[in-house]
Amino acid sequence: MAWIVEQPKSQKELADRFRQLMKEEAILQIPGAHDAMAALVAKKAGFSALYLSGDAYTASRGLPDLGIVTSTEVADRAKDLVRATNLPVLVDIDTGFGGVLNVARTAQEMLEANVAAVQIEDQQLPKKCGHLNGKQLVSKEEMEQKIQAIKKVAPTLVIVARTDARANEGLNGAIERANVYIEAGADAIFPEALQSAEEFRLVAENVSAPLLANMTEFGKTPLMTAGGLQNAGFQMVIYPVTSLRVAAKAYERIFQLIKDEGTQEAGIEDMQTRKELYETISYDDFEALDKNIAKTVLGE
């Protein structure tokens, strides 16, 4: 991991970098990385920040996104991503894992993990994926208190306030909540499950804060390009579960191939080579730490 062979950035440095990226002219594309390997591949592709999705993280644990995991578990995974990449990470902390005191504890745990930014939503527990039916919301006042709690105990954390009100209170309700959350101290707004390009434009016209779009697949929101979202007035876009979906489908294919043919040979071309793997995880840098380790030479 990068923190062993590189000088790790502090939480404040990472948070300041995230704030800078939010303000740049080009929209900030933030891919979801459910583990450190995915994070390293995303960094290699040239991304400047990463997203840890609650949905993707829980799925990687073999669990549904129903508020089952704990703040400590999520912070541990977030720490893996930060240590591996030295990039600012935006972490989905769901509802904050409980009431105001739970939110304060969660914020402290994210600070200790060197997380740059957190995303907190206004659903009630047990929460659900934002693109499913049956979501229930907390009051605006309760969400305000949660945002204020993060500000108080972790003032360097960037706060992205997510509202799921589009499904329950309509677009105007989502806009109203967004503006309340900004007044409470949110640094950016994530309006979940918008249903058209026009809705993205209307939110941008009525909310004066950096805006984050969710380009998740198979949901209520139509897929739009980064350029289209930027033109609509959004500053950030996440792809929360994309890499996990692709990886899971690759698992299905290779496991079925081995089961059917008794060998993986026909799938070799789809694999990362040993050399590519070692480059991704900075194998040589680790080896160089210990002069007593014989230099590994890979064949072509």
Swiss-Prot record:
Claim: Lyase is one of the keywords in the record: yes
Top-level taxon of origin: Bacteria
Protein name: 2-methylisocitrate lyase
Keyword Cytoplasm attributed: no
Protein's organism: Halalkalibacterium halodurans (strain ATCC BAA-125 / DSM 18197 / FERM 7344 / JCM 9153 / C-125) (Bacillus halodurans)
General function of this protein: Involved in the methylcitric acid cycle. Catalyzes the cleavage of 2-methylisocitrate to yield pyruvate and succinate.
GO MF, one example: methylisocitrate lyase activity
Annotated positions binding Mg(2+): D92, D94
